[in-house]
Amino acid sequence: MTCCQTSFCGYPSCSTSGTCGSSCCQPSCCETSCCQPSCCQTSFCGFPSFSTSGTCSSSCCQPSCCETSCCQPSCCQTSSCGTGCGIGGGIGYGQEGSSGAVSTRIRWCRPDCRVEGTCLPPCCVVSCTPPTCCQLHHAEASCCRPSYCGQSCCRPVCCCYSCEPTC
């Protein structure tokens, strides 16, 4: 039951009245976090998988791995993220600082979405180069073919075309 009482890789708990729901993960997946096997077997938050023969490596779902692995709220500042660019609601970026000048570090926001029946809150990828569509968004089924969600097969409507700054 520890899996259900904690959180899903840093996201809201998947507990249901003290018991694991169908989308809840197994405690053997990612160290002490509640992590679905699919997180380890494919990719998480649109970034490369940490899968090793069906099990997670020590790097999976740790709060310090925002840019190159699974992105958790604890490592991302969502308050600075804008939502005014791109195609489709909730896709955008924000600039660091308040001068209005383009910064070399852009917070690329990804919107709320559902993955394996679990709601993930907004998060940012801090980078001076635009992430690809599927790196930025752990896409919904309406955006990607389910077997490739979070990887490389987003439909164009999911992608952000109008916010690609020059570093």
Swiss-Prot record:
Coiled-coil regions, chain positions: none
Quaternary assembly: Interacts with hair keratins.
UniProt protein name: Keratin-associated protein 1-3
GO cellular component: cytosol; keratin filament
Keyword field: Keratin, Repeat
Entry similarity comment: Belongs to the KRTAP type 1 family.
Signal peptide: none
Name of encoding gene: KRTAP1-3
GO MF terms held by the record: structural constituent of skin epidermis
Entry comment describing in which tissues the protein is expressed: Expressed in the middle/upper portions of the hair cortex, in the region termed the keratogenous zone.
UniProt function note: In the hair cortex, hair keratin intermediate filaments are embedded in an interfilamentous matrix, consisting of hair keratin-associated proteins (KRTAP), which are essential for the formation of a rigid and resistant hair shaft through their extensive disulfide bond cross-linking with abundant cysteine residues of hair keratins. The matrix proteins include the high-sulfur and high-glycine-tyrosine keratins.
Pfam family membership, one: Keratin_B2
